[in-house]
Amino acid sequence: MEEPMAFSSLRGSDRCPADDSLKKYEQSVKLSGIKRDIEELCEAVPQLVNVFKIKDKIGEGTFSSVYLATAQLQEGHEEKIALKHLIPTSHPMRIAAELQCLTVAGGQDNVMGLKYCFRKNDHVVIAMPYLEHESFLDILNSLSFQEVREYMYNLFVALKRIHQFGIVHRDVKPSNFLYNRRLKKYALVDFGLAQGTRDTKIELLKFVQSEAQQEDCSRNKYHGVVGHKGLLSRPAPKTVDQQCTPKTSVKRSYTQVHIKQGKDGKERSVGLSVQRSVFGERNFNIHSSISHESPAEKLIKQSKTVDIISRKLATKKTAISTKAMNSVMRETARSCPAVLTCDCYGSDRVCSVCLSRRQQVAPRAGTPGFRAPEVLTKCPDQTTAIDMWSAGVIFLSLLSGRYPFYKASDDLTALAQIMTIRGSRETIQAAKAFGKSVLCSKEVPAQDLRALCERLRGLDSTTPRSASGPPGNASYDPAASKNTDHKASRVQAAQAQHSEDSLYKRDNDGYWSHPKDCTSNSEGWDSVPDEAYDLLDKLLDLNPASRITAEAALLHAFFKDMCS
C-alpha cells in the first residue's frame, strides 16, 4: 500500500536541501502575512496604537482573528493582552450580546472576562486578559489521569457559571477552553455563537434569538410546492391578522366613499370590504367616479350592496376561521407526527408532500464533531444540554487519547458515527423522545465505554492494534465500524492521512505507534475508576432531557475528593 505523503519526509534519506528551503519560504510568507494583517488592523482601528503594541497573530477563525499585544501600565511593567478583532460583517446585536456575556458572566469561575473594547466604524476589537496555554493535541497523551480530572472539573465550573445566566455557549471544544498546565489556570472563551435559554439573564441574547427567528421566517417566506408541473414557488399564506388589516390604498376607492354614509364602525368595515381587489380578488363593482343615478336608484343599489357585502363578510369570517383551524392542525401535525403523518413516515423514502413542506428551522451552529444529536437532527428546542454533550466528547478524547474523536463531513455521517459508539437503537429511542424519527439500515450495538477507551489508548494488551490511525486521532473498532454507514467508513479511512499524523510513526506492519521521544504519562491510567466512565455515560446521554447538568456533574462521585 502506498505510504501517505505526510510521512515521506520523516525518513532522513528522503530529506534534501529543497525541503528546508521550502519550509523557510513558507515561514517567511506566513510572517509577512501576519505583519500585513497587523498593519491593516492598526489602520482600521488607529486608537489601538496609542494603547497597545501588537506582537503577533495567535489565532484565526471564521468570525474573528486574535492577536497578542502588550499594554504599558502606569506602574512601569507590561501586561499581555489578547485582542479579538471581529469581522466587519458581524451583526451589531451579536457583537453586543457577546460583550454582555463577557461582562456579566465573565471574569470568574474559569470564564474569560473583558478589559476594554474599541470600535472604529464597522471594526470592533475586544481586549481580554491573555492566558498562555498549551495545544490540546500536544499534551493529550502526556496528561496524567489526575490532570484529566482537574481539567474536566474546571470545565464544569465554567459551564455551571454560564448556564446559571442562561447562556448556551454552543461551541465548547478544547481550543475554546484554554489550559495553562504549569499555572493550572483555565479559561472558557469565545461567546460569538452563544444563545440564550428561555429564561436567560443576558438581555441582549433575547434580541439575538428574535433576530434569528425573523431571519428564519424570511427565509421560509417562499416555499416549494411539488405538483405535476414540477417545483413551484409561492408566498407563504398570510396570517389572520394580516388578512383582516385594512390597506391604505383602499381609501382612494370611490366605492368606499359612495357606500360610507354614517360614522358607525359597521358601515366603515363594509366600505373597506368592498374594494376586495386589494386582497387579490376580482371586483366587479368598480365604476366611474361620476354618478348619473337618481337618489332612489342609489338607495336601492345601496341596500342591495349592503346585503351582498354582509353575506361576503360572513363568508370571509368563516374562511378566516377555517384557515386559522388549518394552521393549528398543521402545527399539531408537526408536533405529533405519529398521529398525523403521510405515507412515507417511518420509511426510507420521501414523498412529494414532505418535499413540499418548509424546511425545519433550528440552530445548527457549532463545531463538527462536538455537536449533540439534537443539533444534528435539527431539534428546535435546544438547551444548555448541548454544551454538556460537547464536554462529554472532550472527556471521551481525554480517556481514549484520540483527538478529534469524531470527524465527519456532514450531519448524517456525524450521527452515524455517534451510533457507532452509543448504539443505533438507543439513538432512535432518544430521537423519538424529542420528536424526531431516525432510521438506520442496520442495527449497531452500543459499545462499552471502558473497553473502547482502553482499547484505543492501548491499555488492553489482548486487543490487536488498530491500523486505522495513530493515537491522537479518531478511530473506530473495526468490528463495530463494519456495521455503520459507508460514509462513516470512508471518513474513518481518510483520517489516517490527516496532517496531524506526522507526530506518529508507522511500523513495517502498517500499525501506528508512539515515537520514542514521546513523553507519555501513564500515571493513574492503569486504574481508571468506574466513576469516570459513569460520568462519561451521563455526559453522552443521547436524550438532552436526561443528560447530566454542569451543577450535577460537579457533585458526581468522580470528583468526590476535589474541593468545590
Swiss-Prot record:
GO terms for molecular function: ATP binding; metal ion binding; protein serine kinase activity; protein serine/threonine kinase activity. Coiled coil: none annotated. PROSITE patterns: PROTEIN_KINASE_ATP, PROTEIN_KINASE_DOM, PROTEIN_KINASE_ST. The keyword Signal does not apply. Residues 52-564 form the Protein kinase domain. This is Cell division cycle 7-related protein kinase. It comes from Mus musculus (Mouse). Pfam families: Pkinase. It is found in: Nucleus. Its EC number is 2.7.11.1. There is a cross-link at residue 260 (Glycyl lysine isopeptide (Lys-Gly) (interchain with G-Cter in SUMO2)). It catalyses: L-seryl-[protein] + ATP = O-phospho-L-seryl-[protein] + ADP + H(+); L-threonyl-[protein] + ATP = O-phospho-L-threonyl-[protein] + ADP + H(+). It comes from the Eukaryota. It is an enzyme of class 2 (transferase). Belongs to the protein kinase superfamily. Ser/Thr protein kinase family. CDC7 subfamily. Kinase involved in initiation of DNA replication. Phosphorylates critical substrates that regulate the G1/S phase transition and initiation of DNA replication, such as MCM proteins and CLASPIN. Keywords: ATP-binding, Cell cycle, Cell division, Isopeptide bond, Kinase, Magnesium, Metal-binding, Nucleotide-binding, Nucleus, Phosphoprotein, Serine/threonine-protein kinase, Transferase, Ubl conjugation. ATP binds at residues 58-66, 84. One of its GO terms (cellular component) is nucleoplasm. Its main location: nucleus. The active site is at 171 (proton acceptor). Forms a complex with either DBF4/DBF4A or DBF4B, leading to the activation of the kinase activity. Interacts with CLASPIN (via the acidic patch); the interaction is required for phosphorylation of MCM proteins and CLASPIN. The keyword Cell division applies. GO terms for biological process: cell cycle phase transition; cell division; positive regulation of cell population proliferation; positive regulation of G2/M transition of mitotic cell cycle; positive regulation of nuclear cell cycle DNA replication. InterPro entries: Kinase-like_dom_sf, Prot_kinase_dom, Protein_kinase_ATP_BS, Ser/Thr_kinase_AS.
